[in-house]
Amino acid sequence: IGPEVPEEELIWQDPVSVGNNNYDINAVKQKIVACDLTIQQMVETAWASASTYRETDMRGGANGARIQLAPQKDWEVNKPNQLETVLDILRPIAAEAGASLADVIVIAGNVGLEKATGQLIPFKPGRGDATQEQTDSASFDVLEPIADAFRNYENKNFAYNAAEVMLDKAQLLGLTAPEMTVLIGGMRSLGISFDGTGILTDNPNILSNDHFEKLLDSDNEWSPVGDGTYQSTSRSSGKSNFKASKVDLVFGSNSQLRALAEFYAQNDSKDKFVADFILAWTKVMNADRFDLTT
């Protein structure tokens, strides 16, 4: 830009160290597969890392691996105990491969999805790791979500419309309505929910459209249970089946979201559901990769 550009790092610019593109990605994958992390742990950690991105000011995201630093490592939504367990396993893998932890977190999420889909998930290396000294903790406090519909998380200390916050989060991530829908349905089908609410599948290790199939099943009658959640009862057997949140049920009550949910719930949309989930997932993982041209 010119000879007078300052050489020092400016903390308000959220600096990130230069990443490494030259390492064996397949070797990293093999090491992750060999560890005892579950699909849910890997996918949820990768989502937690990348989903802080805000298209409005281009802050947050997976680059920098600031999920291992304060304040993000202590956010309730990130399940600090589970997060530290996952990071303790991924750190030595990253160090041995010469990769950044930021890259390895995303690779682990992709490994989880590859286990759940049997398909190859696109990946672009080159993320760097930030240090605590490069991170203005106070400025990152405002990125903490009061709700994350994708993980069925709500901070009970705030009063808000959960569906509106869901739309706000999707907009911050730059997602379209179909992308938001397929990501939420896919995350639930993988058993990812902060408190277990909204898990409507019997096989959480397979990425499927089960969530929307069960949600829209006319045999299920949903009733409030007093804690902001809803219980389904089978009309045919009278048996209580599933518990869901307001965010889950808005995909049945809102006409536009229901249209999307019905499309993905179709028997002939199973492959389309998986393909669209992979595209939307990759979009979020790469949201802050301003160094990528394609």
Model features per residue range: what roles?
Residues 1-294:
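Long, well-ordered alpha/beta core segments of mature domains
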